Amino acid sequence: MKQPVFTGAAVAIITPMHADGTVNFEELGRIIDDQIAHGTDAIVICGTTGESAALSHEEHVECIRFAVKHTAKRVPVIAGTGSNDTAFAIEISKEAEEAGADALLLVTPYYNKTSQAGLIAHYTAIASAVTLPCIIYNVPSRTGVNLQPATLAELAKLPNVNAVKEASGNISQVADVAALCGEELNIYSGNDDQIVPILSLGGKGVISVLSNVAPQQAHDICAAWFSGDTAKSLELQLKALPLCHALFADVNPIPVKWAMNRLGWNAGPLRLPLVEPSAAVQQSLENEMKAYGVLK
């Protein structure tokens, strides 16, 4: 049995920016503190929601180092270090390990894609270069490649391939992963609207966008489930659905960064090519945050 890196809700945290587009580390620290104070079970730094694709190598490593130092072991810090360049993924994964990260989040190679055999070779090379637990991230809507359950079962044989963040949206596929991998691979939901379905298949929690704006609520969905109150967990999941949908009414992290600014955080601008959400998306976010109770 592989011990999970965390159990519950981990925030896929935004990267706040100054008006000039540089990283706002002071605000990042404030957000981390607030997340931990409101029940977040782990911090995921430099993931999709953190605009990792628009960060320079130096910024990427600096964000990881800052998150590790500022979090100070209060909760695990998971560093997004995936790349479609295996050599670069190894390099930045080693840097994350040296910085003191607790685990790595490794998205499947995108654009150049690859075969299932290539995915096995890619992840084997990274896992062999570090000692940290590796969380594989399957998000075919972004990468253009779907990591098959049988491929995950093969990768789960590697001692430090610890988990998968499953964001395919395909619950049947997640069930197949659970059946094939058993206790050799932990499963996290990569979609806030599928937390309870994945928990019901033995999942250990969620890597969450919702947690940015509602950390306590995302934590509570998972906590209720693990306390045995599955009816309460389902109730909380269903209550969150309209806001979850609003947060994905445009490409992530466009809506959530706007929402964080609206809630009073100095989240700052997006980096191009991402731009502000439409007026319709903004109004939807406004309405759903008020209905959910996170915006007065």
Where are these regions (language model features)?
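Active-site beta->alpha loop and helix N-cap motifs at the rims of alpha/beta catalytic domains
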Residues: K2-V11, T15-G144
